[in-house]
Amino acid sequence: MKIIVLLLLAVVLASADQTAPGTASRPILTASESNYFTTATYLQGWSPPSISTSKADYTVGNGYNTIQAAVNAAINTGGTTRKYIKINAGTYQEVVYIPNTKVPLTIYGGGSSPSDTLITLNMPAQTTPSAYKSLVGSLFNSADPAYSMYNSCASKSGTIGTSCSTVFWVKAPAVQIVNLSIENSAKNTGDQQAVALQTNSDQIQIHNARLLGHQDTLYAGSGSSSVERSYYTNTYIEGDIDFVFGGGSAIFESCTFYVKADRRSDTAVVFAPDTDPHKMYGYFVYKSTITGDSAWSSSKKAYLGRAWDSGVSSSSAYVPGTSPNGQLIIKESTIDGIINTSGPWTTATSGRTYSGNNANSRDLNNDNYNRFWEYNNSGNGA
């Protein structure tokens, strides 16, 4: 009986800070409020199809020397039948661009685990167009389906910027990415955006994958007025600054978010959503784990997130209801002791001070407040 009582007490203590309505620095949803935020509501009527890796219409490493060549071939066949691209285990130093196409693609690693198949490149946002062309230009010809994506980056002046730093870029709907690793290996001690995966389309599925990088690892949704839904399951995502960011509707279920400290240890931010203020659904983290390097356990300087106020130059230029207002729910997940528990959210990219709504009666989409919420999380950082 004593053991049972102690265990129950431990559970209560671990979840004590998850009591609704929370505090102004850490708002918590009530049970009834949390019912508005489920996988189904974020999917918004989409039923993701099952994923199969039992066939291969194209094989990279046996018939195709690059992933891009296999993607081009699949798109050029036309039609609306799903095409399957198998990537044999190995390391591929290249970019992969999937332009808008009606051909649904499944791209999967042929190894026994996602670590066996790695797509990697060192390509930060500060890369010059000439260096970019030297890195990836050999992959593209003017008649290729994705040439316009390449050319838009190659023709930039100065540097290529955040979007063009992407290693794996998806602009087509209904793409499935399975059992592989995508890495942008760029690393320095300052601010250096370097995107591993970017999705600018709808109905994207990422399963059993690894997304590796530091700053801006995953760019999930462009923030356009169109619907951009993506569904991540059993996927590992690592980084340090804003390493999950963007304006799409993204569901992360049974995923791991790992905060690294090998590049910088002064601060870290996991999520930076850029949700349109008229959209109710941004990022949904469900039954997942947020953890990281031991350096954050002692300093407690890592933050769960901040708002990416894209296009807003300063806090005084922010207009509630017009400017972006990132939306994020973390629900029934484990948050390790790497997070500043008393203040897990930090100042927006515009300089706008974080403002949480812990009123007993509240509008969860009131744009005078940040739209960051938690429900029924556990762990030393909850």
Curated annotation (Swiss-Prot):
Summary of the tissues where the protein is detected: Expressed throughout the midgut with particularly strong expression in the ventriculus.
BP GO annotations: cell wall modification; pectin catabolic process
Reaction(s) the record says it catalyses: [(1->4)-alpha-D-galacturonosyl methyl ester](n) + n H2O = [(1->4)-alpha-D-galacturonosyl](n) + n methanol + n H(+)
Gene Ontology CC terms, in alphabetical order: extracellular space
Residues flagged as site, Transition state stabilizer: 215
Domain of life according to the entry: Eukaryota
Pfam families (alphabetical): Pectinesterase
E.C. code: 3.1.1.11
Annotated catalytic residues: 216, 242
Pathway the protein takes part in: Glycan metabolism; pectin degradation; 2-dehydro-3-deoxy-D-gluconate from pectin: step 1/5
Cysteine pairs bridged by disulfides in the record: 153-164
Glycosylation sites: 179, 340, 376
Signal peptide stretch: 1-16
Function: Pectinesterase which probably plays an important role in the digestion of plant cell walls.
Note, other: May originate from horizontal gene transfer of a bacterial enzyme to an ancentral weevil genome.
PANTHER family: ACYL-COA THIOESTER HYDROLASE YBHC-RELATED, PECTINESTERASE 53-RELATED
Protein name in UniProt: Pectinesterase
Protein source organism: Sitophilus oryzae (Rice weevil)
Encoding gene (name): CE8-1
